[in-house]
Amino acid sequence: MNSSFSAPAKKSLGQHFLADRYYIDRIVQAVDPRAGQHLVEIGPGQGAITFPLLRKHGALTVIEFDRDLIAPLTEAAAPIGALSIIHRDVLSVDFTALADGTPIRLVGNLPYNISSPILFHALDHAAVVADMHFMLQKEVVDRMAAGPGSKVYGRLSVMLQAYCDVTALFVVPPGAFRPPPKVDSAVVRLVPRDPATVHINDRRRFADVVRAGFGQRRKTLRNALSTVCEPAHFEAAQVRPDARAEQLEVADFIRLANVEPA
């Protein structure tokens, strides 16, 4: 039974609504909601994932910016379960306050135009997030899960993998959406690491080091990091200054960032 409704996609909001039952079911199976968990969906759209999750779990919080979707979501959800709708820009939502002591599980078909800001916003609240299941452009998922030496290994890869276990799950073709996007999508799972195991002394400095390293990725680290690292830092962190950012493991960036400035 599918309770999703029809609504026009708004290009300005980067909307592409999932419509293929096979992929909807695969996402719900990947999330596998259990009793007592606090599920939060970002951008429910026409309810393709919303209503199967609600039917399986009984309660769901959704964050939707498009006011035209609020009434139909509310109406369609009424006979299924308890749907709580937050009508706001997701980047303004305080996930820590929303969790209210219970870890939240984030789910969503993220708008292509703001997927990276949403990822970093969720990362800021990783301490209260149990896991995340997101659908994004495949190229973004490839970057998220990439390892050292890959052409797509970069700032996004390091920043996310420093704080989360990242697993690309499966590809979703354009034909599964209405309207179809021009590129493949993919579903990814992120599980925040135990804060006690994330040995980053200063998150801002870590971000600065990673940003500088990949900002000039063709340069050696000695040159790319000249504004944030001194020569002695490389020796202290046991990192070769003649290497390039794409050759470093996540742990190498963490060690570099953790070296105390002279």
Curated annotation (Swiss-Prot):
<protein>
    <recommendedName>
        <fullName>Ribosomal RNA small subunit methyltransferase A</fullName>
        <ecNumber>2.1.1.182</ecNumber>
    </recommendedName>
</protein>
<dbReference type="InterPro" id="IPR029063">
    <property type="entry name" value="SAM-dependent_MTases_sf"/>
</dbReference>
<feature type="binding site">
    <location>
        <position position="43"/>
    </location>
    <ligand>
        <name>S-adenosyl-L-methionine</name>
    </ligand>
</feature>
<dbReference type="GO" id="GO:0052908">
    <property type="term" value="F:16S rRNA (adenine(1518)-N(6)/adenine(1519)-N(6))-dimethyltransferase activity"/>
</dbReference>
<keyword id="KW-0694">RNA-binding</keyword>
<dbReference type="InterPro" id="IPR020596">
    <property type="entry name" value="rRNA_Ade_Mease_Trfase_CS"/>
</dbReference>
<feature type="binding site">
    <location>
        <position position="16"/>
    </location>
    <ligand>
        <name>S-adenosyl-L-methionine</name>
    </ligand>
</feature>
<keyword id="KW-0489">Methyltransferase</keyword>
<keyword id="KW-0949">S-adenosyl-L-methionine</keyword>
<comment type="function">
    <text>Specifically dimethylates two adjacent adenosines (A1518 and A1519) in the loop of a conserved hairpin near the 3'-end of 16S rRNA in the 30S particle. May play a critical role in biogenesis of 30S subunits.</text>
</comment>
<dbReference type="InterPro" id="IPR023165">
    <property type="entry name" value="rRNA_Ade_diMease-like_C"/>
</dbReference>
<dbReference type="GO" id="GO:0003723">
    <property type="term" value="F:RNA binding"/>
</dbReference>
<dbReference type="InterPro" id="IPR011530">
    <property type="entry name" value="rRNA_adenine_dimethylase"/>
</dbReference>
<keyword id="KW-0963">Cytoplasm</keyword>
<feature type="binding site">
    <location>
        <position position="64"/>
    </location>
    <ligand>
        <name>S-adenosyl-L-methionine</name>
    </ligand>
</feature>
<dbReference type="InterPro" id="IPR001737">
    <property type="entry name" value="KsgA/Erm"/>
</dbReference>
<keyword id="KW-0698">rRNA processing</keyword>
<dbReference type="InterPro" id="IPR020598">
    <property type="entry name" value="rRNA_Ade_methylase_Trfase_N"/>
</dbReference>
<dbReference type="GO" id="GO:0005829">
    <property type="term" value="C:cytosol"/>
</dbReference>
<keyword id="KW-0808">Transferase</keyword>
<comment type="similarity">
    <text>Belongs to the class I-like SAM-binding methyltransferase superfamily. rRNA adenine N(6)-methyltransferase family. RsmA subfamily.</text>
</comment>
<feature type="binding site">
    <location>
        <position position="18"/>
    </location>
    <ligand>
        <name>S-adenosyl-L-methionine</name>
    </ligand>
</feature>
<dbReference type="Pfam" id="PF00398">
    <property type="entry name" value="RrnaAD"/>
</dbReference>
<feature type="binding site">
    <location>
        <position position="89"/>
    </location>
    <ligand>
        <name>S-adenosyl-L-methionine</name>
    </ligand>
</feature>
<feature type="binding site">
    <location>
        <position position="109"/>
    </location>
    <ligand>
        <name>S-adenosyl-L-methionine</name>
    </ligand>
</feature>
